[in-house]
Amino acid sequence: MEKGKGVSRKGRKLASSRRRQAREPADGQDAPVAAEAESWPSDADAELQGFFQDCGAKERGFVTREDLAEARFSFLGGEEPQMIFDWVDVESRGHLSLEEFSSGLKNVFGSSPGTHRLRTKRSLPSQRESVTSTLPVPEEADAEEKEAFLALIGQMETGHSLSEQAEIWKLWRELRQEEPQLAGNLEGFLAKMSSRLQEAQADREALAWTLRKRDSDHLYKVRQLYEETEEQIRREKQQLQAQSDSRGMALSAHMQEALEAKEQEVQRLAEGQRELEAQLLHLSSTQQEANRENLQLREAERDLAGQLEEVRGQLQVTRGHLDTARTRGKVSWQIEEEPSVPRANKEAPDPQAVPTEEAPLPELFGNNDNWDQFLSSIEAHSHRTLRLCWSPPPSPSSTSAPQTPRIVRQISISKISALQFSQEPASDPDPGPRGSPEVPPGGAKDGKGVEDPKGQDEQDVSSKQPVDSPDSDARPKGSFLWSLPGALTAESGTVEAAFRDQLAFEAEPPPQGLSSSPQSPAGSRKQTQTPDLGDKSLWSGPDPAKQSLEREVMAEDLKLGLGSQGATALPEGATEPSLSLESVDQVGPERPVQDATHLARQESHAKGFQEAPGQVLSLDSLPTHLPQSLEEQLRPEEGNLGERGQQDPGSEASESHGLEARSMESPQQDDPLPNTSQPPAETEVPAPGQMSPPRGSPILGAGAGLAVGTPETTHTLLTLAESEAQPGPVSMPVQVESKSGAPQPTEPEAESRPEDPRTDLQEAERSSSPGDLTAGKPQADPDYLYHVVFLGDSNVGKTSFLHLLHHDAFATGLTATVGVDFRVKNLLVDNKTFALQLWDTAGQERYHSLTRQLLRKAEGVVLMYDVTSQESFTHVRYWLDCLQDAGVEGVAMVLLGNKMDCEEERQVPTEAGRRLAQELGVSFGECSAALGHNILEPMMNLARSLKMQEDRLKASLAEVTHPQSTKRAGCCH
């Protein structure tokens, strides 16, 4: 047995050695194959990068297990990429970076001992044989044992390591040799355990796969929830931001509206403050002016009060002298008639017994003075300004009544400077009833109504009142016209003052020439109104004896401030002349005097002038008809004393009315200065043999009084005064047409003209040469003449606009223009006269050919549209095309929108018209022919544009010089 065992062991040993020998070359051959299998494929990198690009891992920067589930690699199986991912993802993050996955895959192929097992599947028998050949089978094992063992291993189908296979081999061989019945049990156990291991391995892999799947699904869901949460948060943020923005915008708009309201309120308050400040300034200036006027009035009141006291004192003295003279004269007559009472049947005493020229006022003239000498001195100095007008008293009606001494029955002491406002000449000696309708027959008294203590009416300081006479009751008291409204009384109206003035004038040297003082002396504030020179009775021909008298009186009157402004100075320094009676009411519209003010001024003339005879007046308002007053005042009185005494009251009243009418005409008709008429004025001069109109002729021209205050006017006035005394026919202006006498149709003024007579006089002097009688007429040729065409659709208001422009009135019911209409409008713009030929075209289409013909010579165009019609505004471009077709270039245009008063029906906004005007480069405006709004301004602007265009055209003209031929020096060069 032992020997057989030894043989078997030896044979077994030999068999193992033979297997080892047979395996060595196989091992040598397998070694390079294994090394070759474990190497990294060359195309694996390119395939791996393509996978990263396809699955989007390259863009994300990492790879997930879901990406590997769809991966297909040539060097890996279907599930091997996921297994490699699980092996590399130690932290179970669910994603790996590209570098981590690539390095892990390379490590699996390079150094891992199970790489060959992962790469290859030994399903083929050849591979199994190669594997079994590598088992550590002892050499002494025979072929049968090897085949049985390999069959056992093949049945197990489990991969075991070489050490495990060696242990199984030993265990199986020992059981086979020692206990063969147990070898089958071992084989069944190994097969069963192998199957269980396989099942466990499969379960493990399935569980791992499920776990990984769940993990990936969980991660996907978490990521999805995260993204949804982020999206919801983003939407919530956007919604909150939108709500916040809307609230902010609403709050901002509300605050902006509140701020604008506050700003408007501040602007209104500022405007109100400015208006209040302006009103305060105006009120303060008015108050200051009123204070100044009050001061002036107080000073004038004090002066008047002082003068009144002085006049009262003089009046008292005069009363005393008159009472004394009356008493003495009465006593002398009584003494003279006492012896003649018992001889009533005898003849009348000789007129020479009682001399008519005895001295009736011994206290005034002295006991040794001669009355004849006094009267002769009065005749010698009658050319002075002092006059004594007297008439013999009537004879007594009965011897029983006391007779008035034959003294001066009526004494009128006056100065020539007070004659301007009189209604009859001062040389009229008859104090008969000449009361005008405006003045009661009692004569005018002073402002305070001084009365005689005995109840008798007192004389006015300057009125012609007769001394009390026996026939004072039979004859009505004469009403002298010095006290009419607007007249002034003389300063000295008593006998004593008359003689004092007479002595003062005799002491003065005679004047050397006719010169006017620019300022009037104090105490000479008198006003004069001239009678009409048209009366034939006032003109007695040139009297050589009156020439020196008139010259001296003229100079004396100018020295005394004759023709000055009036007793009451106007508060604003107006220089308009003061006219008496109704002549003030007939002043033209250039002197707007209210009725109440006029009546108050008349009353002040009737009262206040007697209280203030000494106020100073300026010479600025000297009337231009002064020589006529002087001529009538200083006419000879020979032959009038007897006639005046025999006139009846009817003739005197008619003469008084004639004087009133003449005083109304004198400011308009008797202006001897042809170059001082207001423009426009027409003056007609009669022929040398033609007489002026009579005293009662109607007024031919109602012109306003001129304020003549310049030295040239005064010099002309004095020259005319001298020329009246020269022999020869007299040529006086008989008709003066002024603005007030012949009003022209009112049109919108291109320039505001002041209504000051001075300004009108200066304009007349500038526009006409001296002596030009037609200077006031409008110029025949304008400065500029332009051709203007109105374009626009029908019914836009072109005809209404032109009608309002010409007639200053809106005409209703105008029909559509047929063809074309033509008007001429004269405008005064920038001191230049523009004559605009305005062509009103028809808007109907059938007249457009005629309109195109007119456009060829157009220099200005007015494009008019209706703001209530969008179609008319659109057709403006059609009219522009018509202008272009007509070949008109450089035309001044105005775009004008009419009917702006129809705001509710407006279809064309103002901004649209302004934009179109800016696009065309023309001026723009909107007007309303119904309301008369903005009618004249566009035409004035068009006139200025036409003038500027003409100026530019003149400036752009180039002078064409004729080429000059150069002369050659000789015939050959």
From Swiss-Prot:
One GO cellular component, as annotated: plasma membrane
The keyword Cell cycle appears for this protein: no
InterPro entries xref list: EF-hand-dom_pair (IPR011992), P-loop_NTPase (IPR027417), Rab (IPR050227), Small_GTP-bd (IPR005225), Small_GTPase (IPR001806)
Keyword Transit peptide: no
Family: Belongs to the small GTPase superfamily. Rab family.
SMART domains membership: RAB, RAS, RHO
Coiled coil: 219-310
Binding site for GTP: 792-799, 840-844, 898-901
Protein name, entry field: Ras-related protein Rab-44
Gene Ontology molecular function: any one: GTPase activity
Family annotation (PANTHER family): RAS-RELATED PROTEIN RAB
Keyword terms of this UniProt record: Cell membrane, Coiled coil, GTP-binding, Lipoprotein, Membrane, Nucleotide-binding, Prenylation
Compositional bias ranges of the Pro residues kind: 428-440
Subcellular location: Cell membrane
Listed Polar residues bias regions: 123-135, 665-680
Extent of Basic and acidic residues compositional bias: 445-457, 548-559, 598-608, 654-663, 750-766
Gene3D superfamilies (UniProt xref): P-loop containing nucleotide triphosphate hydrolases (3.40.50.300)
Signal peptide, first to last residue: none
Gene Ontology BP, a term: mast cell degranulation
Membrane topology value: Lipid-anchor
Lipidated sites in chain (S-geranylgeranyl cysteine): C971, C972
UniProt feature, compositional bias: Low complexity: 513-524
Organism: Mus musculus (Mouse)
Domain (EF-hand): residue spans on this chain: 77-111
Residue numbers spanned by region Disordered: 1-42, 112-140, 319-368, 421-481, 493-708, 724-779
Compositional bias (Basic residues): 1-21
Main localization of the protein described in the UniProt heading: membrane
